[in-house]
Swiss-Prot record:
Function description: ATP-dependent annealing helicase that catalyzes the rewinding of the stably unwound DNA. Rewinds single-stranded DNA bubbles that are stably bound by replication protein A (RPA). Acts throughout the genome to reanneal stably unwound DNA, performing the opposite reaction of many enzymes, such as helicases and polymerases, that unwind DNA.
One Pfam family this sequence matches: Helicase_C
UniProt domain HARP: residue ranges: 127-198, 231-302
EC number: 3.6.4.-
Domain Helicase C-terminal: 620-773
Protein name: SWI/SNF-related matrix-associated actin-dependent regulator of chromatin subfamily A-like protein 1
Domain of life where this protein originates: Eukaryota
Encoding gene, per UniProt annotation: smarcal1
Motif segment (DESH box): 453-456
Lineage: Eukaryota, Metazoa, Chordata, Craniata, Vertebrata
Molecular function via GO: ATP binding; ATP-dependent DNA/DNA annealing activity; helicase activity; hydrolase activity
Amino acid sequence: MSVSLTPEQQRRIEENRKKALARRAERQAQIADPGPAQNKHTQSGTTGGPAKNNQHFASDRGQSGAPTRQTQLIDINAACTKTAPPTSITAASTASSFYGQAGKPSTGEKRPPKPPEPAANIPAKKPAVYLRGRCVSHSENRFRVEVGYHADLILVFKSIPSKNYDPATKMWNFSLEDYQMLMEQVAHLPSISLKPLEGMEGLNISASTCRPKDAAAMAALMRLCQGWQKPGATIKGKCVLVSRSRLEVDIGYQADVIGIFKQMPSKSYDMKTRKWTFLLEDYGKLMADLNELPTVETEPLPHAVLQSFSSQFEKTQSQAPVPPEADLSHIDPQLTRSLMPFQRDGVNFAVSREGRLLLADDMGLGKTVQAICIAAYYRSEWPLLVVAPSSVRFTWAEAFRRWLPSVKPDSINVVVKGKDSLRSGLINIISYDLLNKMDKQPPSSPFNVIIMDESHFLKNMKTARCRAALPLLKTAKRVILLSGTPAMSRPAELYTQIQAVRPALFPRFHDFGTRYCDAKQLPWGWDYSSSSNLTELKLLLEESLMLRRLKSEVLSQLPAKQRKVVTVTTDGINSRTKAALNAAARELAKGYHNKSQEKEALLVFFNHTAEAKIRAIMEYISDMLECGREKFLVFAHHKLVLDSITKELGEKSISFIRIDGSTPSAERQLLCERFQASQQSCVAVLSITAANMGLTLHSAALVVFAELFWNPGVLIQAEDRVHRIGQTSNVDIHYLVAKGTADDYLWPMIQAKMNVLEQVGLSESNISENAESASFHSRDRQQLTITEMFQRSFDEDEMLALMDQDP
């Protein structure tokens, strides 16, 4: 049965939008005639164009500007949205289908009385007003907005200089020059989402660095990307970005095409490549002329390039603008004073990108300290989440303690078990694996600032770790990705990181894959494993989200050797090992009157430390391999540790060499030559005392000390297996130090001895430069006593004699 609306009902609906959305209208919707005046208003989620009556109300109230009605609607909307979850308005969310009144509740309209209903009387079922609309082309230089009525939206419309209301269509239209202004203002209305104008979907309204000065010109460029395919074309080509200022047209010979090229003011022909290049400011005219040729098909530059280099299409500049100096006065001086110039530049870049970037500096350039400084810049938005490989969780905690002394140590929360809280600290540090396990226990509110260490762990969007991380990253306001090995040769592995930082850049993976992964359609599906247009991709990433400096570029600012203390944990060791380690520590604490017994007890403690560290050592080596470190050295002392490392590498089919006390002298040189010549992943597993001299392994630039040794001279000799004549890179030295083990006492002693050597000129570098990042050495009397035992029990000759005997 169907009943038409009475004239009285129509009049009342036109007078007041809230009456049209009254509950009485909802109840009548089941039997009402399915006309636009009812169905499109009463049924939330109905697809189609905007309701005519809503547009009519917009015209009446927009033109009359009756304050009482507008005030009533705004007050009710505010009351409704108080309990509503925040709505993120992004290109991804607005790319969904257009709904005239989708999700629009009819709250607050139980009856038609004139005063507004108090918030307490608003039904709880539909607490948020949510309105979807779209921008569509209206004429050559204008666009219109198809959307239902919302009082706040009408106020925005009225503020646009080129506003025009069309009574015939009951819609508002605007000049393309004001498109940017309108979308920016609508982005601040949490209950409204407008689908972008066709061709402008990729435009990131919120990113100040990517705003075009002339939205109309940008819209025209975007339209060049539409409908460029010509089925009957006999000549096909494409435009490719070759520098920040120039594009290349890769196309076969055709007289008309060459004629167009020669007319371009910035034309340049390369005799070697036989390609034409042009300034970006000529792109619009170039494409417009080429599109006029019926037999020529030219693939345009992708939306992402137009968006990221928008200012270049207006007036081309060869040099990128230098980011302004960020104000770091509110950050701990201990941190800001320690930044090298290029690291300060990295912080400036991050701030200019509003805290969303991929920091892809080479290993050893201080990505950690830069990330901490960037996060500290946005400290008012904390709590902070740090996601890192399991082996470096505690290294991050120590780094925060060192660089941000204003942060209380007990406010740093390192998640070690799945049952631990993810939000109990101001700084929360978790591993990728644990984040995946806690995926089903999301935090009560999203993290606004997130650091993802070794973000290339997210390279496969199908993995559990990626599925757990991406939702957090999409809701975060600041996203700091760290990776020393961006997969530029495998662009498909970069896509998830691009999505995390700038999701609007490439909303669809297939578009990214066809442009940069040389996508091919095979019988079983699409293959995205290759690469294409890599120069353009590199330029695009550097312009929009990525900062990458190589060691060779900042060599003058770096020390020849950079030492890093990596704090590892003994969590996960079996109860027997743990009990033995604790027992050895207790025995040492008692003290000995007999020097021989003291030495023996110290060696027992050292041996149990090796057993307790094995798991953490293997985890760290695995992380280094996954991070892309193809060649490095691992020094250890105990046979148990050396055996465990080589066994693990063998099981993973990783090439390695091993040199220890049992390796014949004749074989050592052959093993070194094999390592030096290797072009694939290869790890040199070496004994600290048996392979610390006489070997040249400078094809690697990373040394990992899985165990400590209390003679710093031996450690320096081991470091110099790679830091020697022929080394063309800076050398990274990583010391793995475990709390609650003999390392607590060995490391302070090593520092003290090295300081003495430096003061007398016997060492050119201080091994304790980075030691502050590992504050293991407490000042309780028991620990000092054990340290003194290590110092007095062995002179250098005795140490070497005892330690050369592997247990």
